[in-house]
Amino acid sequence: AEIDFYEAVARGELGEGDAAEALFARAAPQFSGHGPFLGARARNALRRGEPRQAEALAQEAGARDPADQFALAYLSLAWRVLGDPREAWLHDYDAQVQQRPIAWLAEPGALEELCSVLRGLHRAASHPPDQSLRGGTQTEGALFRRSHPVLRRLRAAILAEVAAHIARMPDDPDHPHYRRRAAGVRLAGSWSVRLTGAGFHIAHIHQAGWISSALHLVVPPPDPADPPHAGSLVLGEPPAELGLGLPPRRIVAPIAGALVLFPSSMWHGTVAFAGGHERLTVAFDAVPVG
């Protein structure tokens, strides 16, 4: 059964959706209630044009683990394909996505000093093979576990913004995102990304998070060769390999020194830019504690 599961995933990613579903069906009795299995089968159902099946699988995965971000991400896509108004309830691209400046970074020299520190950490020659970025580098390890005073100050400023963001959330125990509100948060991951040339992020979500982010620090200048919305954060556009052909729900233009916060279950990526200029960001995932 385990071999069937792995083969099903591989066949699905190769575009052999029907063959993958046959293998998923055969393995299903041994993977009852298994979140990764349910998510992988829901993904394949979307690719096969079976949004009702994807909905049922995603709901089963979410019932098993309410914090399963893939379950919410695939459920959102299933509801969108079905024209179900609950998609807008689950992912509210106006209320749940916020862009606010970090006041400290507006102080003279603060942004430049932070960028200098971060550039010193970007030692890799290319992007990590298991991450969403293409044409750039990502720092190693947890960025906010480093002891540099500039990074410590950034961490404190970010935590204050996250706390304010959570305070603005409605009290809704029935909503998969809002019901996780808590007295505090823990940063489950933190990193910096430096993109150059035609660098970009493919559409993805963050399974280990609750609130995800993009803090833009260096924004490339406009280039006549740029595509529309070059360098922007794109939210709600599903992965191209699913073949759904759905446009973004929201596009956020980057502003140097401003932090964007959004649910970790929202599909997100970036639009490539044409010039050889730098795009420098910090990102993190926050999870509730207490």
Model-found features: residue ranges?
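Short coil turns that delineate tetratricopeptide repeat
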Residues: 1, 31-33, 65-67
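Catalytic core of non-heme Fe(II) oxygenases with the double-stranded beta-helix
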Residues: 156-159, 163-261, 266-290
